[in-house]
């Protein structure tokens, strides 16, 4: 299953940086040097993982991930600070979310300690690919999937946990705010489905409306709930918030919305700032009456929503440096990149060497 190569010890290259034009970084795949692979046979615990040269994985055509879509992924970042430290942001929360998703998809999973260790190893092995401060981040993508062959029967004989990394720039390049299309035909998630976990099956089914929205000039899509078609849920890959007066609202999780790590942090910061924070069902009519709106996620961090368009009617929201979104972005980014003291205990330092 794993690439046919001997495991390599985690070591730091003499090169401080890879040969990359950091100013041109986008949010897309860039091949780096190493990846992590661990396997688990049915009825056993996950083996100790290995750092291997980045390579294609060998996969049985009857693997559960190919036959039935049994797979999950996570996403988190490594940050290089001005004083040369390497930081992760709440990796334990991603490990816990992976476990919740694995339970939902009937899969074994690594412990949180093994998950965090894997992320640290991948970051260190690819340290030269971590952009200079202010130029981007190292995006780390852990994946858990059914790698053993299965055809109409349980249990799966083998599960694989792997992680790779890519240097990335900002997910949304336009700092002026997103222009969203409210999708009124396709639905992202359904009650009692998998919308509350990062199942690999959640994403490509909505590529059609997303591609159409992009062709029409929109930044992204805001989805409505499947049950009524009247309440907002989330973007393609981000949670959504609204501000009305002193009240910050975000849709309640309820199994159809991903419990974002950034979402959780933003709610806590809003309370620190003196706002009333509520998780509730948000009718579209309420959302359209908001003073301000923004989305949150590992990729997007905190990004203002400039407008939403529903059935050709466009509604605008406040954007700019004086918005709550801007304050949240600055505060969260300062913590993540070590520019301010982390009084929350959210960051994990993994390397003290410059």
UniProtKB/Swiss-Prot annotation:
GO cellular component terms listed in the entry, alphabetical order: cytosol
Any one GO MF annotation of this record: branched-chain-amino-acid transaminase activity
Disulfide bridge positions per record: none
EC number: 2.6.1.88
Residue numbers bearing the N6-(pyridoxal phosphate)lysine modification: 198
One GO process term, biological-process aspect: response to wounding
Location in or out of the cell: Cytoplasm
Cofactor(s) required for function per UniProt: pyridoxal 5'-phosphate
InterPro entries for this protein: Aminotrans_IV (IPR001544), Aminotransferase-like (IPR036038), B_amino_transII (IPR005786), BCAT-like_C (IPR043132), BCAT-like_N (IPR043131), BCAT_family (IPR033939)
Tissues expressing the protein: Mostly expressed in phloem.
Pfam families reported in the protein's UniProt record: Aminotran_4 (PF01063)
Upregulating conditions: Transient induction by wounding. Follows a diurnal rhythm.
Catalytic reaction annotation: a 2-oxocarboxylate + L-methionine = 4-methylsulfanyl-2-oxobutanoate + an L-alpha-amino acid
Phenotype when the gene is knocked out: Reduced methionine-derived aliphatic glucosinolate accumulation, but increased levels of free methionine and S-methylmethionine.
Keywords: Aminotransferase, Cytoplasm, Pyridoxal phosphate, Transferase
Major localization class: cytoplasm
Remarks, miscellaneous: Although all the other members of the family possess a branched-chain amino acid aminotransferase activity, the exact function of BCAT4 remains unclear at present.
Family classification: Belongs to the class-IV pyridoxal-phosphate-dependent aminotransferase family.
NCBIfam families: ilvE_II, PRK13357.1
Function: Converts 2-oxo acids to branched-chain amino acids. Shows activity with L-Leu, L-Ile and L-Val as amino donors and alpha-keto-glutarate as an amino acceptor, but no activity for D-isomers of Leu, Ile, Val, Asp, Glu or Ala. Acts on methionine and its derivatives and the corresponding 2-oxo acids. Catalyzes the initial deamination of methionine to 4-methylthio-2-oxobutyrate as well as the transamination of other typical intermediates of the methionine chain elongation pathway.
The protein's name: Methionine aminotransferase BCAT4
Source organism of this protein record: Arabidopsis thaliana
Protein's gene: BCAT4
């Amino acid at each position: 299953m794993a690439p046919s190569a001997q495991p390599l010890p985690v070591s730091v290259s003499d090169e401080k940086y890879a040969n990359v034009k950091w100013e041109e970084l986008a949010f897309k795949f860039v091949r780096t040097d190493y990846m992590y692979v661990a396997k688990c046979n049915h009825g056993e615990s996950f083996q100790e993982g290995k750092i291997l040269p980045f390579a294609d994985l060998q996969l049985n055509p009857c693997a559960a991930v190919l036959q039935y879509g049994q797979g999950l992924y996570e996403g988190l970042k490594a940050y290089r600070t001005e004083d040369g430290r390497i930081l992760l942001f709440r990796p334990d929360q991603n490990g816990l979310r992976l476990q919740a998703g694995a339970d939902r998809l009937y899969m074994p999973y690594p412990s949180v300690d093994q998950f965090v260790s894997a992320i640290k190893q991948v970051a260190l092995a690819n340290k030269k690919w971590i952009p200079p401060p202010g130029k981007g981040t190292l995006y780390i993508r852990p994946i858990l999937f059914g790698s053993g062959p299965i055809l109409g029967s349980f249990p799966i004989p083998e599960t694989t946990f792997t992680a790779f990394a890519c240097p990335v720039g900002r997910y949304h390049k336009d700092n002026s705010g997103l222009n969203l299309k409210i999708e009124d035909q396709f639905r992202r998630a359904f009650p009692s489905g998998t919308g509350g976990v990062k199942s690999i099956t959640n994403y490509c089914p909505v590529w059609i409306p997303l591609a159409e929205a992009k062709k029409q000039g929109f930044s992204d899509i805001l989805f409505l709930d499947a049950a009524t078609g009247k309440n907002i849920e989330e973007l393609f890959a981000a949670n959504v918030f609204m501000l009305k007066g002193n009240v910050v609202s975000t849709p309640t999780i309820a199994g159809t919305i991903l419990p974002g790590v950034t979402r959780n942090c933003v709610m806590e910061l809003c309370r620190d700032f003196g706002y009333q924070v509520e998780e509730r069902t948000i009718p579209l009519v309420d959302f359209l009456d908001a003073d301000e709106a923004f989305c949150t996620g590992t990729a997007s961090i905190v990004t203002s929503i400039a407008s939403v368009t529903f059935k050709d009617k466009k509604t605008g929201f406040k954007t700019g440096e004086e918005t709550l979104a801007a304050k949240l972005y600055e505060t969260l980014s300062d913590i993540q990149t070590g520019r301010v003291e982390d009084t929350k205990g959210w960051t994990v330092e993994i390397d003290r060497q410059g």
